[in-house]
Amino acid sequence: MQKLPVKQRLLLGFTLFSMFFGAGNLIFPPHLGAQAGSNFWPAFAGFAVSAIGLPVAGVVAVARAGGFDQLASRVHPKFSLVFTILVYLSIGPCLAIPRTASTSFEMLVPLVGGGRGLQLGYSIVFFAAAFLVALHPEKLTDRLGRVLCPALIALIFVLFAGCLLHPVAAQYSPPAAAYARLPAFEGILGGYQTMDALAGLNFGAVLALNIQALGVTEENAIRQNTIRAGFLAGGLLLVIYAMLGHVGALTGAAAPDCTTGAEVLSALASALFGRAGQLLLAAIFLIACFNTCVGLISCVGQYFHTLLPRIPYPALAGFFAAASMLISNIGLAGIIRLSTPVLGALYPAAIVLIALSFLPKAFQKRSVYVCTVALTAVQSVLAALPFTAAFVTALPLGSYGFGWVVPAAAGLLVGFLFP
């Protein structure tokens, strides 16, 4: 099997990490730390299971199946087409890509001021730069893994080191009510809400292009290097999340009025470095959002290029970048209202697909996939609809957002027993 040098393996892991690590990944751990307080570490263990374990499992599942569409086609080819299109649009131009610009701009407002004109100019420059980098998805290892990812990690470490050398509080605060009884379970819920498993299903194709660009052509070697990159990215996420969660727990004790992860980080940066801290935080958010934007434009453009091969990849990448720029300026709130329920309906089915792929061979038959995914999807769609949500909440675990677990288990049993 073709092998890559250790340095190139590390670059692949850095590249995948940089695509995963967006604004939401910056915000969730500090908020978890501030809320969990003295119960931070058990809460973080639960958070890691769902916020790191699921995305890495998604990367591995797609690599083993030979692609996201191949994994979804185990249900049915038509399901695969519809499901993958919905997932790519939901995490792409309909939600995640526009939010990268709007979120990073919000962190710059305290430094440069606001205004529609300034936001428009910023978004044009932001998406133009992201488009230029995404023009060559096979070179993301050089652009993201070699340059931007190390810069991002270094800036986060500056914030963490400042907190270690000059802690803003002597100890963690008492936990909030939700984290007082079952901190690990609350951590699992928080990690689940990142919905990063969807990204794990999508980034594998772009990573495969970068592996091929390094001279690896054997399918098995591409698969193994993708899986290694997934585990390395997961390890980096674990370390960075722990750092951010720790500083969040200390900052929550010093500034208990902070209600969001962004407020926690802003309070910490200001306490440590003053105005320079706000500049540091803005740079962290800018790089994180830019990396994710490039990764999403690349994977969405690449998928639709395979679906519509007559349309060149640069044209598709440019279209998605331009559409995301417009949405981030004129219609993001409405798009979020529409896309969030769609994501909520898609996410359980994606998790079930990932989980099924790791089951023994006896479960690898179409009836298992059809029954399990179908019952999961029905429950998830009903939970996303406002007029049926109350009924679905009454199901076991429904009030926690896991009402799909029992239908999925029932579907698994029926599908397994089906001849």
Which residue stretches match the model-derived regions?
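Selective recognition of specific alpha-helical transmembrane segments in multi-pass small-molecule
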Residues: G53, A57, A151-C163, I227-G252, ...
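Hydrophobic alpha-helical segments and their helix-loop junctions in multi-pass secondary transporters
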Residues: P93, I97, I153-A180, A197-L198, ...
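Hydrophobic, membrane-embedded alpha-helices of multi-pass small-molecule transporters
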Residues: L11-F21, G162-A169, A178-L244, L280-A288, ...
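Hydrophobic transmembrane alpha-helices that form the core helical bundles
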Residues: H31, K78-G113, C289-T306
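C-terminal membrane-solvent junction of multi-pass transporters and transport-like membrane proteins
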Residues: I351-L413
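Membrane-interface loop-to-helix entry segments
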Residues: L135-C163, S339-I351, V370-V378
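Membrane-water interface regions at transmembrane-helix termini and the short interhelical loops
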Residues: V62-L71, F127-L148, A213-V216, M325-L338, ...
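TM-loop-TM module centered on a large, flexible mid-protein loop between adjacent transmembrane helices
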Residues: D69-H76, I240-F290, P341
